């Protein structure tokens, strides 16, 4: 059933720590199976469901800069190929909070729900570390808070 797998080096996930070279830091190796054709990107049809709470792109030309939610979706979709992926921008709930004063970016807080066979055999900590690893660039460039729900298809209620 699994066509290929990837090996990820997962280390140093606290967002204020700099990324360390795998040679110089302890690492955990996680094998994540790929089990869907990466070319198919259906949204909300069949067994795969992708939900977004914000606009895919800003601007109208094909070279427009994607927003943070869209970049997060692409990274998670590419590596985990989830059967369900919900990304919700809840930054508006934190506007005016002390930590947000003076910030120019407005996409800082997200809720993410991922249902993927790639999580099978992983405990909750390893699942979250994997998601943080995949979103490292976003965490380093303004993503302030991330709430993660990570499940396997057998742990998630059926949508029949």
UniProtKB/Swiss-Prot annotation:
CC annotations in GO: chloroplast
Residues annotated as signal peptide: none
Main location: plastid
A Pfam family of this chain: BolA
InterPro entries per UniProt: BolA, BolA-like_sf
Region (Disordered): 39-66
MF term (GO), any: metal ion binding
Subcellular location: Plastid, Chloroplast
Keyword terms of this UniProt record: 2Fe-2S, Chloroplast, Iron, Iron-sulfur, Metal-binding, Plastid, Transit peptide
Annotated transit peptide: 1-50
Biased segments, Polar residues type: 39-61
Superkingdom, natural source: Eukaryota
Similarity-based family: Belongs to the bolA/yrbA family.
The protein's role, per its UniProt record: May act either alone or in interaction with glutaredoxin as a redox-regulated transcriptional regulator, or as a factor regulating Fe-S cluster biogenesis. The glutaredoxin-BOLA1 heterodimers bind a labile, oxygen sensitive iron-sulfur cluster.
Note: The GRXS14-BOLA1 apo-heterodimer model derived from NMR data shows a domain arrangement totally different from the holo-heterodimer showing evidence for a Rieske-type ligation of a [2Fe-2S] cluster.
PANTHER family recorded: PROTEIN BOLA1, CHLOROPLASTIC (PTHR46230:SF6), PTHR46230
Assembly: Interacts in vitro with GRXS14, GRXS15, GRXS16 and GRXS17, but not with GRXC5. Interacts in vivo only with GRXS14 and GRXS16.
Entry protein name: Protein BOLA1, chloroplastic
Gene that this polypeptide is encoded by: BOLA1
